[in-house]
Swiss-Prot record:
This is UPF0294 protein YafD. The keyword ATP-binding does not apply. Keywords: Cytoplasm. The gene is yafD. It is found in: Cytoplasm.
Amino acid sequence: MRKNTYAMRYVAGQPAERILPPGSFASIGQALPAGEPLSSEERIRILVWNIFKQQRAEWLSVLKNYGKDAHLVLLQEAQTTPELVQFATANYLAADQVPAFVLPQHPSGVMTLSAAHPVYCCPLREREPILRLAKSALVTVYPLPDTRLLMVVNVHAVNFSLGVDVYSKQLLPIGDQIAHHSGPVIMAGDFNAWSRPRMNALYRFAREMSLRQVRFTDDQRRRAFGRPLDFVFYRGLNVNEASVLVTRASDHNPLLVEFSPGKPEQ
């Protein structure tokens, strides 16, 4: 685990809290007392979006219109500006961000907004070998109404690297987390799978973890070299709906997926 790898937790009315990686997998489900479940409904709605460091107009209106009804919002390239922190703490019980690198004013990295407090939180970082910029990932776990624990993995994969060694290396600690979790899993984010070797490495990883890919019928996901960059993988859940929202508020389009935590597909 790298030095300087930590998560910052934002909760309404409380000072921001720094959370270090847990010492062992044994703490999954034991790190914090299980509180209210993520959803009291028979469905779990998520929004997945590389928000482009909030550099474009309309990002906040997209979050307000589509994020407020979601139980989970998985952001990549999220800068902890006052506007984003205000939205997160006003609409969610917890917001956890892993600073990948610190910009002049506000740290940027993956950020998970959740309608329940996580019972486990593990920040991860990997440095890009060419630009020396870090990319981050965040593993959080939430109680479900049926007493199962849902593991959520928010990923922003390394972009600039020769070959796929560094790309695959970033997936290894994520795989360790998933392998030690017996319940349902959602793994989503910007995987930068713009080459065939990267896509093959990602699909191989998903197979090894018994993860399925969410399919989008009108697939308007951001592409590079003809390949989609953003993905949602899952296990132990059913997919009810999946759509891509076309917007100019970022250089990526948000993914909207509704799961039901009932009996998983065979």
